[in-house]
Amino acid sequence: MNLRHVYGKTYVAEATTALIPIYKLNDRDVVLFDTGYAKLDRSGLTNLLEENGLHPRGVICSHAHFDHTGNVHYLQLRYGTLADAQIIEAGISVNPDAYRANYVALTYGKSREIFLEECFIADAIIPADADHLDFCGECFGILQLPGHSAGHIGIVTPDGVAYLGDCLIDQGQIDAAKLPTSMFIERDLESKRSLRTLRAPAYILAHKAVVTDLSALIDSNIAFLLQKSAEMLDCLTDGMTFADWIYTFCRREQVRTKNELKFSVVERNFDNFVDWLVDTGRVEVRREFCAKHYYRVG
């Protein structure tokens, strides 16, 4: 894992699937924004900290997904790191049963099997309306960016660098993705649009870029959500069940996996888009003996 300078006292660690921002409080103490994936990033993150003589005094979590909170509890135990999280994400992170709220397609048993490493107890809670956080002797800006998850936040370093978590992804990720991860699509679109007024010397996207201009990426991320919703509608034949509809979409998009976690993410994401299409009046749900059937509107 490499350490790359971004701006001022802000750096990023180049983890396996994401960038982990690191803000230097001094030559030794640092604050991390997220911690990577337990299985893939723990040894690399530990080696990076040890080799550079860095002590993780604190971590601020953008949201409770396994590729972001995988090493929070580990850092708390090994280094005495303090962890802060937004109130919704902090609640989700307390144990595998709660963590399932972000992975609802998994059974409780499977959630307990998979997510023991990802769970942690936050040392402090970030309110849902907070715009700043006094932490480890510094003031960090807080951007409330719900949508990707219910309590997703961005963080602004004291030197002005904006970490946007998963609110935006880079163009390479868009080009490779089959279906966006978004819990509440309408809120996600609002959060993405709100970034048009944000000004910073650098912007860090967890997946997986550092940029100085967001304009094109905001447009392409919004277009990606709208494009995928249109493709989903194209796959809907009136009267389909959820199973029929997702099968048709995944067959068209060549989404194939036998990995239960990956499948659960696809199922969850698809279901979130279906809910949005219903909420926006483009799809109607009809129930017969408690079974849902979907119909296009107009």
For every predicted segment, state its role.
Residues E231-G298:
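C-terminal regulatory/interaction regions
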